[in-house]
Amino acid sequence: MGDTTVPSKEKQTNWKIAVLFFFLGWIFIYADRMILNPVQTLIRSEFALTNAEVGLISSIFFFTYTFLQVPSGILGDKFGKAKVIAFGFAVFGLFTGLTGIAGTFGILLMARAMMGIGQGFYYGPQYGLSSELIPTKYRTLGSAIINSGQAFGITLGLVASSYIAFDLEGGWRMPFYVFAIPTVLIGLGILLFVKEPKHDNTTMSEAEKPKFMDLLKNRNLVLTYLLVFCSLYGFFVMCTWLPVYLEEVRGIARSDTGFISSLVAWTSIPAALLYGYISDKIGKRRPVILCLLPLAACSIMLLLMTESKTLMITALVCYGFFGKLATDPLAIALIADNTPRNQLSTAFGIFNFVGMSSAIVAPYATGLLRDLTGSWNSGFYVSVGLLLLGIVTVLCIKEKKQVS
């Protein structure tokens, strides 16, 4: 869909600077999320929680995060994306630090809920702004670079949390204190150094102006929304429960679970860049996604079926190479390819709202299935089934070759 607005002549940020700051933003978005996971057993012990209640800590975060997606996208389009992003960073940076002082399970849930609200202001405005600034011929590659910050953040959060809590004997609270201040500073940097282009809608008639419901009537957008739900479900099963799975099922030492879990993130970085380059080169996203989803499902099955530690690690590496983090830039490009520029923030808000709905369900459902069945495998099998559904969804997308 073409651009329906007129950019002003005001000087805008070089797209490479924007990519750098948004990359850093994702590092701390995910680091602040992931510092919880290696210390879940300590929290479970201190507050005498069930596995379902531990899963609720993540689910409440993602509930408020998901609730903010569409409103934050609309606010970004209306008042300025960089301003909305900076406000969100201030909120979730503050409550990252306050999570560490929680004295009861209820206060811990409240702090995580506020972290979710703060982080909820990032996704739609960020990808809306980056999609405006990055040239079409670099759109998937640029998104892949930005998105790779998620992998760095996952690694940083998992490894640093394990190291601070267990190796340095800082306990589960200290990692939250450590990450709070740099989080706020990144938001300030985005506000100061990333300037967005201005658009003039005054020359358009009311009939010509795009409407919110147009985004829900677009076939390709709706199918991409469903795709991201299927992809993210398995990813958040991995993010939330993989360290516990490695410790309880595989007998991995607590101090090592963070590093092994981070292999998923590390291998996704070169993969996402490679797929982004290929997609931009051929001008299509759909064929690449169709290759990746079956391989991601097979990776999870290998993780569950093998008794070998070597093959287990191989399965995690393969999931990183073919899974959510590797396919995300392709789905992001699909959204940008099918959305008017002055609705990008809103479109990405809907996209992430649908995707993150899976993150509300996955942590709690997987913990509940473990409590009911006595096995962690049941939750992972659900992830595989949704990936297969995602393949069917992508087959229904109609895509034209993108021209630079």
What are these regions (language model features)?
Residues 285-334:
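C-terminal transmembrane helical hairpin of 12-TM major facilitator-type secondary transporters
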Residues 78-89, 281-293:
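Cytoplasmic membrane-interface "Motif A"-like loop-to-helix N-cap segments
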Residues 67-106:
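Conserved MFS/SLC helix-loop-helix module at the cytosolic interface between two early adjacent transmembrane helices
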Residues 111-152:
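Cytoplasmic helix-loop-helix junction between adjacent transmembrane helices
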